[in-house]
Every structure is written in C-alpha cells, then in structure tokens.
Amino acid sequence: MKATTGGLAGLAAFTALALACNPDKGPVGLIPPTFDRLSEASSAPLVQHIVAPQATDPAIDQALDNHYAWLDTTGRTNHKLFVFMPGTGLTPAVYQLVQQEAARVGYHVIGLMYPNRPGLAKVCPSDPDPAACYENSRLEIIDGIDRSPWVDVNAANSIDNRLTKLLQYLARQYPDEGWDRFLAHDKPKWSQMAVSGHSQGGGHAAMIAKIRLVARVVMFSSVTDSLQGASVPWVATHVTPSDRYYGFDHDLDEQFRSIRASWDSLGMAAFGPAVAPENSAPPYDFTHMLVTDYHPLRGPGRPAHSSSCTDFNTPLAADGTPVFLDAWRYFLTTRSSDEDDTDDETSSASAARRDP
C-alpha cells in the first residue's frame, strides 16, 4: 500500500453551480437531475493499491498488467464503486488521473486490467456478421463463455472473475476499507457500481449496463462498434436506464461518427445536445454528451481519441491539473432522477435477478 497525491495540485472551481437549481435546465417532462459539486473534496493523499491479477487468482494467466485501486479514507464516501476499464492494448496505469478524481469525489475506485487484445474495431468488420462479432466478443470478454473466434477468454480471465477476485482480495487484505460492500454472495453488487472505460473499455461498460442494472455508465471515446458509421443493434436495448449514461469524446476522433451514433442509440440525446466543456461550465445544461475540440497533448497512439482521459494525451492547465477535470467530476457526480442510494440486500437482490 502506498499513498499518492497523483500530481493534482488542486481542483478547478465551478462557476455555474447556480444552474443546478434551475429546473428549466432539466429534460422536459422529467424530474430534473441534480449536480453535486462536492466543493469540499479532500486534498489529502489517496490510498493506492497496485495488485497483480494473478495474486488474486492463480488461474488468471492473461493480461497480467497490474490492477489499480484507490480510495480517500479522509473524505466523504458515496458508497459506490467506480470500475474503469482501459482501451485496446492499454493498462490502468495510463489512466491514473481520472481514477484519482473518482476517488476524490467519494468513490472506491478500481482500474481493472483485462484481456483487451485484439481491437474489436480491427477484427469485427472482416467477420461475416460484424454486428454479432462485436456483441459476442464483448460478452465473452465479460463472462468468459466461448462465443467468438476472435477472442480467447475463459472464465478465470473474464472481467467478471477478475473484478470478483480483486474485490475479495482487497476485502481480505484491507478489511477496514469497505471493499466488501460491493460483493453480495461472492458476486459483484452491480447496482452499487459506476462502470466506465475508454474506447474498447467503454464499450464493455456499455455492454455490462446492457445486461445488468448499474448505478452509472461513463464512456470515454466510446462506444466505437459500428456498421459503416451506424450503431450496432446490441447498443439499442439495455437494462440500465438511458438517463444513467454519459459520454465524452473529441470531435476530431476518427471514430467520432460511430461513437455519436451509439450515444443516439442509447437515448442520450434526449437529455440535450452535446456541449463543449471548454466553452461552458458545470452542469453543462445537464447534457449527457460532452464533445471537445480542445487541442490534446501530443503523445503515443491517437491523441484526439485518447484525449478524453488518458494521462499521456489529456490536456493539462498551467498548474498541472487536467483541463477536463470539471467534465470528469460532472459525469461522476451529477445525479439522475431515479438514482438509487440504497446499499442493502434488497437492492442487490433486485439487481442480481437481472444478471445473466
């Protein structure tokens, strides 16, 4: 265990908090959402755990880069777990800034390593049934049931098992930190989790929310699955309500057309048009879609596609804080009208009945 400040020198002030009290800014016909500024977020060092996947389960033998776990033991908690999944070929280590911010606003946080090669956007277009390829490959990566010739993920290496075994490990090693609250009968308590990820990882977050009721879905530069720019069928139906989905991308992302089509298919446009965060301020008229054209940092990979949240491409202010800090915090803390704060067996049992 070690503590880290993560290089965040401070938190940007929100200049439009008063908008959160204006019901005219909410979606027409719905109870307006609320925006929790959390202006007293802790500046204390975060607790960080770096865990090798195979240390949690010796049967895990793929994608062995470290998991990351974070929490702020001095600040207030929202009793939710934020699970972040990296994009193709990347690891939780290159997304530490957004993970740290989630911890600072009250989440327990896991950056989850999982088998994320090959890139589905590379292989599925050549499949005889691309739509089925995207869906079946994602499901296999999540639960380890053999469905796709393009990926080779068994139950031990699946997202489900990795998350379960990591939570069990953290609960055993650090019993006073509260990781066990996110397990029920040795399974993840999905109703108490915000699932998130970048690119391929954001698509897995959306797939998890399709088949299970989750507290929130935050998609960075995702979902990229498409059929000639149109959204694939699996995106259109989902157990998690549309008002719990949020998306962030760069308008120069070469996959932006596909990503925006997926947001429309998820029903996110019902909550207002996309907003450029650099030209606005929270709560961004309560939109569920943020699209930037802010110049990304140069670095490896595709800077526009990665600028939404990777440490090496997301732009930084003069004081070293991420330019998109307010946007991240908005997605992490704004509340939908039906969001459930309960943390009891009734809630988890209801969610479990929805799980496959």
Model-inferred region functions:
Residues A215-N313:
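The feature captures the conserved acid-bearing segment of alpha/beta-hydrolase catalytic domains
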Residues H79-G87:
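Short beta-strand element of the alpha/beta-hydrolase
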Residues S196-G201, A205:
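Gly/Ala-rich beta-loop-alpha elbow adjacent to hydrolase catalytic centers
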Residues G29-R76:
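N-terminal cap/lid segment of alpha/beta-hydrolase-fold proteins
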Residues A131-D186:
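Alpha/beta-hydrolase active-site loop
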Residues G106-L120:
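Conserved alpha/beta-hydrolase
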